[in-house]
From Swiss-Prot:
PANTHER family reported in the protein's UniProt record: EXTENSIN, PROLINE-RICH PROTEIN (PTHR23201), GIBBERELLIN-REGULATED PROTEIN 2-RELATED (PTHR23201:SF18)
Pfam families named among the record's database cross-references: GASA
Function: Gibberellin-regulated protein that may function in hormonal controlled steps of development such as seed germination, flowering and seed maturation.
Cellular compartments per GO CC: extracellular region
Any GO BP annotation: gibberellic acid mediated signaling pathway
Post-translational modification remark: Six disulfide bonds may be present.
Protein species of origin: Arabidopsis thaliana
SS bond list: none
Entry superkingdom: Eukaryota
UniProt keyword annotation of Glycosyltransferase present: no
Tissue expr: Dry seeds and maturating siliques.
Name this protein carries in UniProt: Gibberellin-regulated protein 2
Length: 99
């Protein structure tokens, strides 16, 4: 019984320390994304949608996806394997959103 209690107390201490560490790092929210460089979504999407028959619709969808993922696959179509986040966003109907 004593072994069970000591194990339980040790586990509780570990959980509390882990929770504390997560809260401390979350408080430094400004520092979390400092190393990430934002890409030029407008320029990348302009290139991506340059051959689209519905350019405005393509640009709107592309910019939305780029702002979420900070990534636009190269070329005018395809290459979505280079940007998995971009390739996984779907509409409410289950269709791929990003051009």
């Amino acid at each position: 019984m004593a072994v069970f209690r000591s194990t339980l107390v040790l586990l509780l201490i570990i959980v509390c320390l882990t929770t504390y560490e997560l809260h401390v790092h979350a408080a430094d929210g400004a520092k979390v994304g400092e190393g990430v460089v934002k890409i030029d979504c407008g320029g990348r999407c302009k290139d991506r949608c340059s051959k689209s028959s519905r350019t405005k619709l393509c640009l709107r969808a592309c910019n939305s996806c780029c702002s979420r993922c900070n990534c636009v696959p190269p070329g005018t179509s395809g290459n979505t394997h280079l940007c998995p986040c971009y390739a996984s966003i779907t509409t409410h109907g289950g269709r791929l959103k990003c051009p």
